[in-house]
Amino acid sequence: MRPLLVLLLLGLAAGSPPLDDNKIPSLCPGHPGLPGTPGHHGSQGLPGRDGRDGRDGAPGAPGEKGEGGRPGLPGPRGDPGPRGEAGPAGPTGPAGECSVPPRSAFSAKRSESRVPPPSDAPLPFDRVLVNEQGHYDAVTGKFTCQVPGVYYFAVHATVYRASLQFDLVKNGESIASFFQFFGGWPKPASLSGGAMVRLEPEDQVWVQVGVGDYIGIYASIKTDSTFSGFLVYSDWHSSPVFA
């Protein structure tokens, strides 16, 4: 019986197609076979997909300080700033030249009088019309120069009861002389005269009637006799008075 079974199995094995070693039909499991030889390296596979972004790493340590860069280009000009506070006053500067020219002028007239004037002496014109600088003395009748320069003096006299001769006098010397004859007519006559003269500080000018009968200067409420003078131009810059 046993030999018949063996023959039957061999016949089946010979008539069957080859089978994969791993698929040999077996009624009973056999022992594990020997390990096979390693296979050949396969071809390179396709690139895989990008992986997910990783998490942010921890902050790194501060780096070393770098070198300073080159200066940049000048920026645009800014808007004007607010006005600053006033500074302290500076020192006083040197004195400048006089911007207002010096002045000197006067005018006076005689009061009404029946008494003849003194001869060969200064003739007072006691009623002051203008004397802002105070250079004329109404008591003595003398003008005293304070501003050096060229002056003009004038006398306008009413002549009555006698002929009149008078002089413009500078420091005791006559600089101009004038005369008017009176012929006894009932109405007064007139006599005018003037002169221009250069004066220095403290020079004096006055009017002086002549000696003798030529003293017919007159004044009343309706007619006057006047003495006037004024500075034409000054050379004060060369005088110690204005130094």
Swiss-Prot record:
Residues 30-95 form the Collagen-like domain. GO terms for molecular function: identical protein binding. Transmembrane segments: none annotated. The keyword Glycosyltransferase does not apply. One of its GO terms (biological process) is inner ear development. InterPro entries: C1q_dom, Collagen, Collagen/C1q_domain, Tumour_necrosis_fac-like_dom. Residues 1-15 form the signal peptide. SUPFAM superfamilies: TNF-like (SSF49842). It is linked to Late-onset retinal degeneration: Autosomal dominant disorder characterized by onset in the fifth to sixth decade with night blindness and punctate yellow-white deposits in the retinal fundus, progressing to severe central and peripheral degeneration, with choroidal neovascularization and chorioretinal atrophy. This protein is produced by a bicistronic gene which also produces the MFRP protein from a non-overlapping reading frame. This is Complement C1q tumor necrosis factor-related protein 5.
